[in-house]
Amino acid sequence: MSTAFNDYCTVCDRLIPTSPQKTNINTRKIQRDNETKSSLQSNKLYCSEDCKLKDSNPLNEKLLSHLHKKSKTSHSHNLTPPLSYSKNLTASNLFEPTTSLSSSPTSSTIPFDELEKLESLLISPLLLPQDGIVNPKQESNPSRVDEYDENEHYLNLADSLRLDSSYQLHSKAHLGYENNLPRSNDLIDDHLISDQIIENNYNLWFRLSSS
């Protein structure tokens, strides 16, 4: 039995040819042969090996079209099968035009030199991590640079704490929370120092603007 879903090729939509039935004397054997043939026919998806190769890899379709054109122009019957062309592909001729595939070497493995070229293409300076790159001036004296960075970090931390404490004092004083201020001598001294700096800056600005 054949159905409309598996009688035609999935690539070229042609009818899949069936093999002729053999005449046997025994009717049971004929029925068994018909059942096996129908099951094999239902498993077929392609009408020929060319369509099977086209469906397996798009590159094979280009190879087959190239072979058909060559057979029409030269009318030669001794062409190599397309399967041998697909086996002889290497990394160097994979992206070349189809005309150069006919002269590909008969090797199914990629040479070691070509593997090194492919690995070198994957390495790019933009893809390398930038965290480990150090200035050559810093490499000349790394201990001094580390000490400077630590000292600078502590100085910035002290300045930020001092500014934060003075900012809290000013904000609470302007909002009328003088009674809730902490009675710490350090905070009071910082508050007085910040007021003196502001007053000096204002006097300097006033002198420059009036002159």
Curated annotation (Swiss-Prot):
It comes from the Eukaryota. Induction: Expression is induced by the AFT2 iron homeostasis transcription factor, as well as by 8-methoxypsoralen and UVA radiation. Present with 589 molecules/cell in log phase SD medium. Belongs to the ecl1 family. Involved in chronological cell aging. This is Extender of the chronological lifespan protein 1. It comes from Saccharomyces cerevisiae (strain ATCC 204508 / S288c). The lineage of its organism: Eukaryota, Fungi, Dikarya, Ascomycota, Saccharomycotina.
